[in-house]
Structures are given as C-alpha cells and as structure tokens.
C-alpha cells in the first residue's frame, strides 16, 4: 500500500516547516532552545499545519514516545475521556522532564469537558504540558485560553500553496496540466492536507485527472 502523501511530505523539523512570519519561527525555536513549552493553543483553518507544528515541537524537545498522548477530540471528547484517559496518563511518573498531551480539534470538546480539562491542566502542571489545536478558537472556553499561550497559524498564500502541491506531483512523477491543478487548488484552498489527498487519489495512473 502506498504511503499517504500527507505523511510522506509532512515536515519533521523546524527548518522544514513553512512559517508565515519570522516572529513565530523565533518563538518556536526559543521553546526548543529552552527545552520546555507552556500549555499551547494552536488555532487556524483546517490543513494549515497545526498538528504538524505540534509534532515538530514534541520531536524537537526529545519527548519520549511513552510520555506522549495524542487524542483526536473530534472522536474522543467526553468528560470521561478527560477524567479517565488523560488523568491516568498525566498522573503517572514521566520518563523524561515532562509528559505532553496533544489534543487535536479541541473545539469539539463540550464546555463541561473543557472545564474538566482545565482542572487536569492545573493539577498536573508540574508533570505535563498540553498542546491544543482548534479551527475555531471562539469555541474554547475563556478559562482554557487564559491557561494556554495562543498561537494562530495563518493560511499560506495561494501561490505558495499551488507551488507546494506542484512540487509533490513532480516528486511523485505525476504528469499534470496546470489548469487541472488549479481546479484542485480552487476546490480545497487553504486546506493543504485535503488537496494532497484529492490529488493522490486522482493520479493513481501517473496522470492527474480533472476532478468530477
């Protein structure tokens, strides 16, 4: 089975990640240099690289895989998940300096669940760091905003977006017409993940076919 392009071309280092401005790059690098992070809230539209940046941070900080818990809150968002799964994880001794809980799509967690999460973050602040990602920061309760450092990731310029997709197609030896590529960009921008997935599905024979 072929590897998904979204995973194959996912940046794994700070140098490989496309930052929208140098201020954010320097901020991320400073956390890595310090060897620690605050609780973080990464916001931005779907497919702009929130989870990728979170994983780059975790990897660059050298966090042990047994000290990392990743939860997709669009599927696991109950109060029980917060109180049981997360609490059981952060409540045990870490192998390294601290544990990291990555909560993807935290805006799917109910207000009651978010309130429970706030309590866990406070109780285990010395042993765990939390990285939350969301598409809609207005759905995150104020108490969590106040406990996390906000980090909004802007969408990439459409020209850069198109160039990145084109480069993947070239690297994969896929023939494509610029007008066909543009139709995929128009249908998916700024969601890079969605565009890559659609292009991969539509180029199994080595040529990018027009979307239906």
Predicted regions and their residues:
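P-loop/Walker A NTP-binding region and its immediately flanking N-terminal helices
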Residues: 1-166, 178-186, 197-200
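Crotonase-fold acyl-CoA enzyme core
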Residues: 169
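Short, conserved phosphate/pyrophosphate- and ester-handling motifs at nucleotide-, phospho-/glycolipid
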Residues: 191
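Active/ligand-binding-proximal structured segments within catalytic/core domains
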Residues: 194
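Conserved C-terminal helix/linker of AAA+ ATPases
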Residues: 199-212
């Amino acid at each position: 089975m072929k590897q998904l392009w979204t995973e194959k071309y996912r940046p794994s280092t700070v140098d490989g990640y496309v930052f929208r401005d140098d201020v954010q790059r320097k901020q991320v690098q400073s956390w890595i240099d310090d060897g620690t992070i605050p609780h973080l809230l990464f916001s931005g539209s779907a497919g702009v690289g929130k989870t990728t940046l979170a994983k780059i941070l975790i990897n660059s900080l050298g966090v042990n895989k047994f000290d990392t818990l990743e939860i997709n809150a669009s599927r696991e968002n109950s109060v029980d998940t917060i109180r049981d799964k997360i609490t059981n994880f952060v409540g045990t001794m870490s192998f390294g300096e601290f544990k990291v809980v990555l909560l993807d799509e935290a805006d799917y967690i109910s207000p009651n669940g978010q309130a429970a999460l706030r309590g866990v973050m406070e109780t285990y602040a010395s042993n765990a760091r939390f990285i939350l990602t969301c598409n809609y920061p207005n759905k995150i309760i104020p108490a969590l905003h106040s406990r996390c450092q906000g980090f909004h990731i802007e969408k990439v310029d459409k020209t850069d977006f198109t160039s990145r997709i084109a480069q993947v197609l070239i690297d994969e030896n896929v023939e494509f017409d610029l007008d066909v590529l543009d139709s995929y960009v128009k249908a998916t921008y700024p969601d890079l993940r969605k565009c890559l997935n659609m292009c991969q599905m539509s180029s199994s024979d080595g040529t990018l076919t027009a979307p239906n």
